Amino acid sequence: MDLAALRDQQRQRAAEVVTQDDFDIMPPRFIGGADVGFEQGGEVTRAALVVLEYPSLQLIEHQVARIATAMPYIPGFLSFREMPALETAWCQLAQRPDLLLVDGHGIAHPRRLGVASHFGLLVDVPTIGVAKKRLCGQFTPPDAAPGSCQPLMDKDRQLGWVLRSKARCNPLFISPGHRVSQATALDWVQKCLLGYRLPEPTRWADAVASRRPASDPLLRG
């Protein structure tokens, strides 16, 4: 596997990422969530996409795609591993979202092309990265109160936000994916929080991708 070529591709695509607001519909009528899991010891990639109506944040659709895993896990190149299954699930959606929250990083990536940015470019939709762990950048820990946040920085450039979404929980790392500004990325993640650590779109996508039981009848069967 030619990692040097993949790095070059990441840098080239990162230059195409738009970090200003460019929404087709504002406020969005439908907000999506995306997450990826793996089966059979990593041999099968399972991508989940959910669509919620806004402002009710009610789940209206979910799709799951399972395909053979394209490449092994290599830190910094996760999008190449996850994107084929995500694209397959995206093509199955009857209702495409106006905004997509992705479990993973946007521009808060060593080469500024996390899966949220990479996938946003692929399908040309506004995306936001919502990650559970830091990949790069420095920050001051946010206060303990829910809603507290601090910028995630790389020297003098802001990569995203570190958000305390729930008390007594580790913070989330929020960053623009594509066609979304820093301020708007933080704003929409906060609007999608309903008392859990994860915002509703990625919370539902995580449940579907992880195959955990869910109370909503739409997920049964």
Curated annotation (Swiss-Prot):
HAMAP family per UniProt? Endonuclease_5
Q: What is its main location?
A: cytoplasm
Q: Does the keyword Nuclease apply?
A: yes
Question: Where does the secretion signal sit in this chain?
Answer: none
**Enzyme nomenclature, EC number:** 3.1.21.7
Question: InterPro entries from the xrefs?
Answer: Endonuclease-V (IPR007581)
Could you say which residues are annotated as the site Interaction with target DNA?
Y73
Keyword annotations for this protein?
Cytoplasm, DNA damage, DNA repair, Endonuclease, Hydrolase, Magnesium, Metal-binding, Nuclease
- Database matches in Pfam families: Endonuclease_5
Q: What catalytic activity is recorded?
A: Endonucleolytic cleavage at apurinic or apyrimidinic sites to products with a 5'-phosphate
Q: Where in the cell is it found?
A: Cytoplasm
Protein name per UniProt: Endonuclease V
Cofactor field: Mg(2+)
Positions annotated to bind Mg(2+): D35, D103
Q: Name one GO biological process term.
A: DNA repair
- Report a single Gene Ontology molecular function: single-stranded RNA binding
Cellular component GO terms, alphabetical: cytoplasm
| Similarity comment text for this entry | Belongs to the endonuclease V family.
Top EC category: hydrolase
**Protein task:** DNA repair enzyme involved in the repair of deaminated bases. Selectively cleaves double-stranded DNA at the second phosphodiester bond 3' to a deoxyinosine leaving behind the intact lesion on the nicked DNA.
Q: Does the keyword GTP-binding apply?
A: no
